[in-house]
């Protein structure tokens, strides 16, 4: 394995992969945050994966590659975030592969925090950290204060093992040991975002598989990124679509063990909890009340629809 090897020698430790599709302006902000890292450039690199963009993504990435000696560009023409992420780790030269979204900004010590952790835990298979939402436009008052923040309880420790999916970090701030990532075949190309389409679950599916195989997943509270809340994600309509797709993803990853009866129970339970949430006397904007009351029922509907589709595909479900 390149990077940190068994005898403790150091080469290129981390390859930071940035997958991007038609977001050249946001990519510029992300890459600038990486260019400003306070870490020896001989220990890490940046691999920008252009996933078939038609805007100025190639130009932006190319300018950073010319300016920064440890930046380079790869291309994945088959659309899909999982495919781009897989291209990224295959192109990487480091012993560890870190992923950050193209609409996220790394804190100045982001790379140094992960390298320090790897040095202290040379066999660690996977870890990630919190992300904090920020907006460039007016943030609607109805959005929950915790919206697009992913931060785990530090009372249990700032560095600690976690169990997916009960505790989790998001795909915009995660690190894998490359040989472990390769041994699982990378990310499932049938899961995740595809172009402008909403999709989730590729990192959850992978991390669950790693856990089942005996690998430990860690949370590092000091490994921080800021994640842009895009304007389109500040509408209730977009969030309802997101809840639905999350449910579909849940069924294809975590929820595979449930039969039809248990799924119906979960749906009714979510609906009942949603009604209780809606009539909660606590004062809040109407749209926020809808957000809280609909997120789990809509997600369970997505899971049930996906389950029925799978039965139809197997010829085990008939409507007539």
Features from the language model and the residues they span:
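Short aromatic/hydrophobic "clamp" motif used to bind/position activated sugar donors
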Residues: 97
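Short, flexible, basic/aromatic active-site loop/helix in glycosyltransferases
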Residues: 129-130, 146-167
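Glycine-rich, basic loop-to-helix element that forms the pyrophosphate-binding segment
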Residues: 76-92
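A conserved acidic beta->alpha catalytic loop
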Residues: 33, 50-59, 104
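Acidic donor-binding loop at a coil-to-helix junction in glycosyltransferase catalytic cores
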Residues: 169, 193-208
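Conserved donor NDP-sugar-binding/catalytic core segment of glycosyltransferases
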Residues: 109-143
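Short, well-formed alpha-helical segments that are part of the catalytic scaffolds
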Residues: 23-37
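Non-catalytic, C-terminal membrane-associated alpha-helical segments of glycosyltransferases
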Residues: 241-248, 255-320
């Amino acid at each position: 394995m390149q990077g940190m090897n068994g005898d403790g020698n150091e080469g290129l430790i981390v390859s930071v992969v940035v997958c991007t599709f038609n977001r050249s302006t946001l990519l510029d902000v992300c890459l600038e945050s990486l260019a400003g890292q306070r870490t020896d450039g001989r220990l890490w690199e940046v691999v920008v994966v252009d996933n078939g963009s038609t805007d100025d993504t190639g130009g932006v990435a190319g300018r950073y590659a010319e300016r920064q000696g440890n930046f380079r560009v790869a291309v994945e023409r088959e659309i899909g975030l999982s495919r781009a992420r897989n291209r990224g780790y295959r192109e990487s030269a480091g012993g560890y592969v870190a992923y950050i979204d193209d609409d996220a900004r790394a804190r100045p010590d982001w790379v140094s925090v992960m390298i320090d952790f790897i040095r202290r835990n040379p066999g660690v298979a996977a870890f990630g950290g919190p992300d904090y939402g920020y907006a460039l436009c007016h943030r609607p008052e109805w959005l929950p204060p915790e919206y697009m923040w992913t931060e785990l309880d530090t009372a249990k420790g700032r560095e600690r093992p976690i169990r997916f999916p009960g505790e989790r970090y998001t795909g915009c701030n995660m690190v894998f040991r490359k040989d472990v990532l390769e041994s699982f075949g990378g990310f499932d190309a049938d899961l995740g975002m595809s172009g402008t389409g909403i999709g989730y679950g590729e990192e959850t599916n992978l991390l669950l598989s790693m856990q089942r195989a005996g690998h430990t997943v860690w949370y590092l509270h000091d490994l921080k990124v800021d994640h842009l809340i895009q304007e389109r994600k500040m509408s209730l309509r977009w969030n309802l679509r997101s809840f639905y797709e999350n449910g579909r993803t849940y069924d294809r990853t975590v929820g595979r063990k449930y039969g039809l009866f248990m799924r119906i129970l979960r749906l009714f339970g979510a609906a009942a909890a949603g009604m209780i949430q809606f009539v909660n006397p606590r004062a809040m904007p109407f749209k926020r009340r809808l957000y809280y009351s609909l997120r789990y029922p809509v997600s369970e509907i997505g899971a049930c629809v996906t389950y029925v589709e799978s039965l139809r595909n197997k010829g085990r479900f008939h409507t007539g």
